[in-house]
Each structure stands twice: as structure tokens, then as C-alpha cells.
Amino acid sequence: MLSRISERCTAVTGLEQVLCRHVWSAAWLRDAEPAAAASQSIDLSCLMERAGLAAYDVFASLYASQRHWLILVGSGNNGGDGYVIARHAREAGRKVTVLSMPHSKPLPTEATNAQHAWQAVGGTETMINPGTSLHLPTDVDLVVDGLLGTGISGPPREHYEEVIRHINALPVPRVAIDIPSGLNAETGEAAGACVKADHTATFICLKPGLLTGQARDYVGQLHYRSLGLEEWMIAAERMDAALCRRVALGDVYGYFSTRRSAVAHKGSCGKVVLIGGDHGFGGAILMSAEACLTIGAGLTRVLTRPEYVAPLLTRCPEVMVTAVETETSGQLEQQMVEAFEWASTLAVGPGLGTGAYGQAALSAALQQAEMHQDKTLVLDADALNLLAERLHSKEMGAAVGAGKYLPVLPNSIITPHPGEAARLLACRVADVEKDRLAAARRLAAILGGTCLLKGPGTVVHCQSSGKTAIVDAGNAGMASGGMGDVLTGLLAGLAAQRMMHDTFDTTCAAALVHGVAADMVAAEDGRGTRGIRATELIPRIPFIVNASVPSSATQQRPSGL
């Protein structure tokens, strides 16, 4: 069933497939390019030639029937790549129109050399005049974006914005060199106009802005090419410089290659307690419980309101359910003491509410988790909203200043969506989305554990190890109620089984299963992403966690950086 899903990033060689599981900052690459070229005994102009040819090969294979290419070149080395592509397209017999942006400074040396090589084969270009209407040939059937590269931060300048908006409106395919113009290579922010590419060819290493933030609206299918630098990039010095991991479809086999022991029993496969489901919110805790069971937890117990006992047992008779009658008599606190003594993993939040029940549950969970540091505590949904209230409570001002108002819980996992993240960080949602990696680091520091920041290009960060990952799975169909509740169940159930190396790997693996399950639903019989329900993910989970390793697979168990 996994074979129905396409990888979001293509790579050709085995080493490229390894390298595209890692992400480096664009700034690091700019500094490293001279050494990369020197390792091949070539100069930067030759490296640009490799990049342009690699991009041309990708685009020509995708659009073999497109005969008139419009190539837009900017004033930097991204434009230099465009000149190389133009030359190869012309030499292959295609009609090529090159439009260049005005620039007040000379082109970089490498771009100048590429421009001269284009002119040497008879190529011409037309400079775009700001403020004048952009007139394009009517028979153009492919647009190649070489306007802005990986160095941009903030919105494109006005005349670049005008050109970008114009080409986005053209009814023809668009492809981007290295990164779509207008997209921040470090964060995935599109602060202004941004080219909406159908395909993007990127070189030497993946950059975070291609994978998270607003990237999925603009990058299209990603194609990674190492330009012959695989051996240089795979060396320890370069791997140690990587910013984070990219967790993707192929990692399923690494995470779940270990089969369950033939002599396993329910007690050895993990015990989970889920706490939630206040009055009116029973569906959330039910979905969490079902997901927890389906990913393989040995025993699952739920603490919830009395009215949800019967529905839970009807839907999931395998679950043990305890009714929470009242939160004022100490009943819930005692139940939480017993839960932490019994379980290996606890999750608080699905359908919890922010009333007295939720407040009592969170208080008891934090207190018990501090006393049971070996247990994993997952906090989601209203548990996070209540945590934010604690964090920013005026009554706790003195404690906030002293840093003693929340315990340090290295085995905790928080799973905020951008709205919950903004409340935890006392900022705007836009501030979270502006730099999701930075936000995840700040969020993980709140309890000293692991943060899973939801959204396209989910970001996972572990405070204690410093490891970060971007989970490149899932789709827009996950923008519906209940998805987070399913994820909470997956996290709790997987953590309880102690299959992974650490909490970071557990969090990455659960997020991957969640995203791949949604991709499986979308891929079935041309289903698509609109109208996917959270409960539809659950039946797909066993096919993911029990996936057989393909005979050609070379993936090893993923490890964080």
C-alpha cells in the first residue's frame, strides 16, 4: 500500500538518497561552495555549469514536449544558472526567450561567465523595464524561474513582485531553479509574491525553506541533485554541519524494521493512560484511544467523564475505561497517582476542556510526571492551552521570574498547532509561522522535553539532545478536526512500546505514521485530499507499522543529528 505514495523529493544515486534525508542551512552552503568546488578541482563557474545542466536535465525530462521555454534571470547566481539552462535548451533545438532583470551592480563573476557562454552560442536576452507592461510571446509553454536564489529574506522588490505575479498568472507549467523566487530558503516564509512552481530542482543539499513554512504552496515536486559532490557531502565534517534531519516516506522501513518478539505479551508491549473527554468532547478521547490501540500498545486505559464510558467500550472494547465523576473531591488526583504507577506513558489533552476538570488533570499530571521522570508524558490540545495560562499567569509572576513554576520533564512531548504554539510563546501565529524551526526550539524549552510543532512540514525538536527534524509527509486533507487527537494516540502508543532509540525518534516516527496514513487515504482510487476524516487514518496504521522492507531498500534506522 505504501507503493501508491510518491516521494516528495526525488534523488538519483544511493548517496543522494541518503543526503536528501538531511538538511543544511542556505547560509552554510554559500560559505561551503568554494571548498566544494575545490574538492572537485574545479572553480565556481564549473560548479554553476553542473547546476544548470542538472536542472536542465530534470526539466527536459519532465517537459519533453514543451518547445518554447521562457527563462527569467535575476542579477545573482540563480540567474547564472538560468543562462546555463538557456544554452542547453537552445542546443537541444528548443526555442528560448530570456528575460533579465535590471541591476545596478555587475553580475557575479560566475553569472557573467554563464551569460557570455549563452551569448557565444547566439543567445540574446531582453531586459525587463520596471514600470512597463510585460509582453511575452504567446507560444511560451514553460517558464523557468531564475530570478532570486537562496539569499533572499523579506519580500521581493517591487519590480520583482510584478514579474512574479505576472508569471504566476500564465496558464503554463512553471519550474524553479534551487528555490522558488520569493521563498525564504531558511524558513519557508513567503513574505511577498512567490513563484508557484510545479517542480523545483535544488542542488548540493536540501534547505529548510524547501520543506516547511509555506513551502508546499510553492515548491511543487522537489528534485535533489548533488552535482557530483556526494562523497564530499557525506564526510563527517559536512554531516556534522547539517541543521536537521528530513524524515520521509522511506524512513518507515527503518523505524519499523524490528518485528515484535514472538514471545511478547500485552504487558511487555506498553501500558498507556489517556486523560481527556470532558463534557461535550468525547469524540477526541475516543479517537486517541483507537489510534493508541492500532499502533500496537499492549494495554490502553482511559480516564474520562461517565457519559463516554459506554461509547468508548462500544467502539473500542479492548480499552479499559475509568469514569471521572468529579474533580473537586480529590478523586481525579488519586486516579492520576494510580495511573502514573501503572502506565509507562500518559497523554493528557484530547477533549480535555479548560474548565475545572482540565485544570485538575493538568496539575496532577505535571506533579506526578515530576515524580516519575522515567515515564513519558504527552500534552496536547487543551492541556497546552492550560499550560499557556500557567506560563503567563500574572498571579505566578514571581515564580515565572524564578523559573520554578513548571517542572523540567525531559521525557515530555508537547504537540502544539501554530495557534497553541502562539499562546505558549505569547506571540502571534504569524510569528510562529515566520520561523517554525526557531519556534519549535523555544517550545521544547518550556518543559525541557520534545516539541512537535504541527503544520505542513511538521518540526520536531528535542531540548536535551538538540536534535531537530522536519517530517515531510501528510497533506492538506489533514486540516480537519480530530487529526491531532489521532496523533496523540499514536505518540502515546508508540512511546509505551519503547521501540525507538529515544523520545525524539519516537516523536518523529509517530508524526511520520500520521502523515503517511493521510497520504495513503488521499492516494486511494484518486480520492484526493478534500474531505479526509481523522478516523479514516486509523485503519491504515497497521499497514505502515508492519510494512515489509523492500528487497531493494537500503534504509537504516533513522537517527537524529
Swiss-Prot record:
Q: Where is this region: NADPHX 2?
A: 417-423
Keywords tagged on the record: ATP-binding, Isomerase, Lyase, Metal-binding, Multifunctional enzyme, NAD, NADP, Nucleotide-binding, Potassium
Q: Which residues form the YjeF N-terminal domain?
A: 29-235
* Residues annotated to bind ADP: 454-458, 475-484
Carries keyword Isomerase? yes
General function of this protein: Bifunctional enzyme that catalyzes the epimerization of the S- and R-forms of NAD(P)HX and the dehydration of the S-form of NAD(P)HX at the expense of ADP, which is converted to AMP. This allows the repair of both epimers of NAD(P)HX, a damaged form of NAD(P)H that is a result of enzymatic or heat-dependent hydration.
Q: What name goes with this protein?
A: Bifunctional NAD(P)H-hydrate repair enzyme
The organism of origin for this protein:
Leishmania braziliensis
